[in-house]
Amino acid sequence: MSTIEERVKKIVAEQLGVKEEEVTNSASFVEDLGADSLDTVELVMALEEEFETEIPDEKAEKITTVQEAIDYIVAHQQ
């Protein structure tokens, strides 16, 4: 089983169409990985599905980097 970090990075790479090597923990979805607002919505939906969790809009807006996504998932795993 992959770690949460590996799974988040794989989803980010797939959703944003970038190489997994480009997906560093400090990478910003918009500035570093070229995501637009639709990409970020789709990314949040993919994370919710993968980790069987719900990310409220007000929380999703604050998740702007790969590490913030990892931290949120870790904190909200059952």
UniProtKB/Swiss-Prot annotation:
It comes from Pseudomonas aeruginosa (strain ATCC 15692 / DSM 22644 / CIP 104116 / JCM 14847 / LMG 12228 / 1C / PRS 101 / PAO1). Its main location: cytoplasm. One of its GO terms (molecular function) is acyl binding. Carrier of the growing fatty acid chain in fatty acid biosynthesis. Residues 2-77 form the Carrier domain. It comes from the Bacteria. The keyword Manganese does not apply. InterPro entries: ACP, ACP-like_sf, PKS_PP-bd, PP-bd_ACP, Ppantetheine_attach_site. PANTHER family: ACYL CARRIER PROTEIN (PTHR20863), CARRIER DOMAIN-CONTAINING PROTEIN (PTHR20863:SF76). The gene is acpP1. One of its GO terms (cellular component) is cytosol. Pathway: Lipid metabolism; fatty acid biosynthesis. 4'-phosphopantetheine is transferred from CoA to a specific serine of apo-ACP by AcpS. This modification is essential for activity because fatty acids are bound in thioester linkage to the sulfhydryl of the prosthetic group. GO terms for biological process: lipid A biosynthetic process. This is Acyl carrier protein 1.
